[in-house]
Amino acid sequence: ASEDFGAVTKILIQKISKFNLNQKIKIRLITNGSYISNPNIQKALTSIKKFDSEVWFKIDQVRSKEVKAINQINISITSLKKNLEASLSKCPTIIQTCLFRINKKLPEQAALDAYINFLKPYEKKIKGIHLYSLARPSEQPSKDRLTRLTQSEIEDIAVKIQALNIPINIYS
């Protein structure tokens, strides 16, 4: 997280106000959420809330083993919940999820069930879910094991996630 996030947000708000762009520009924070519960980040999010703003909160997996393998971070389910709740408390939040094959295998049903169960308590607060697959070759150490899903495979997964009653957009 940038220590300058609050200052940058303040400048952004000043410029939007100065040029009367309040109804013309959407402020969008795209984040993995790892620092979103930080008081300085929370204060900055509060300041942009009055503008047309939203957070795109990246959640590819919710089980610790998969999160570590895919995103190379150690995060507990408790921390992930805390960070999502911090985002939801400040701005409309869209979940952004990348889906792909690992070792030529589709995402496991158990992983999808964990994802759905994780988001279920927040379904009335989450503005939407964006599903997509790899757009270009991965730069991660496991890149040789990752492959893109087809449009129909993403659509099949979206049908399962629709149990959440959250609007879903598919990008492929």
PLM ranges: what are they?
Residues 2-145:
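Conserved AdoMet/S-adenosylmethionine-binding subsite of the radical SAM
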Residues 143-169:
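Aromatic-rich peripheral "rim/lid" segments of glycoside hydrolase catalytic domains that contact
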Residues 133, 167-172:
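Acidic carboxylate-rich catalytic motifs and surrounding loops in phosphoryl-/glycosyl-chemistry enzymes
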